[in-house]
């Protein structure tokens, strides 16, 4: 007899029966809605392993997961059969979560393939009859009508690549972000100076946001162009020159410190004496320990690209 680690005898009996292919096939032939049943090649039933879905999610369910090929033979359909011996007001949402997890796991092997259909089925034999709750997860919202409009339609899209710059600069405090990220792949950002000056003069960003913005420009370009960019920016904004130069200097200093740390890491990884490095740098034992953490592979040889 097959043993199952389950929370109740109900679950154990359910799994003993519904993990048997012939029993599962009969169950689906009898209980699947006709239009869905006709999509499935029930002769191709395959019981999926327990590792198919995240363990934390599986702990919420007493379920069985079968996969079947479609009748056209191209693609898969999954059937989740959930067992419940007492009602749960959020059962529909739980089944939706499980279905999403199955879809995610399916496409992890090949992100180009379409999402599979996942058919959740609930097997119920609780003391309260008939089953009292909707099995449409959209009915669980306080406003099901709005939920249907939201989740049955395409989600809102903010595609800055197609928004005219003249419109973007009217977007108040989010304008700087949208403008820079729209044009960041341009080799030369000097053409944006006029618009950036207008936005910065209107105090549409705080110091931390401007720091992040300038650092972003530096990281995605080169230092010479960055210095030219800063010079032109301060020329156009003499009243903000000190503020911008202070931020730019802070960015340069931070980059210099990180560069020094990277060099010391490389020295250690290539056999340099740790005591010698500690002596000439004056670093503490804790700082030396931090330096012993290996560089990510992509950073190890980045100097070759310069």
UniProtKB/Swiss-Prot annotation:
UniProt key word Signal: no
Signal peptide: none
GO molecular function, one term: DNA endonuclease activity
Listed EC numbers: 3.1.21.-
Highest taxon of source: Bacteria
Pfam families: Transposase_31 (PF04754)
Function comment: A low activity DNA endonuclease yielding 3'-hydroxyl ends. Expression of a repaired protein increases the frequency of recA-independent recombination, but also decreases viability probably via DNA damage as measured by induction of the SOS repair response; in a RecA strain expression has no effect on viability but does induce the SOS repair response.
Family: Belongs to the Rpn/YhgA-like nuclease family.
Identification of the protein by name: Recombination-promoting nuclease RpnD
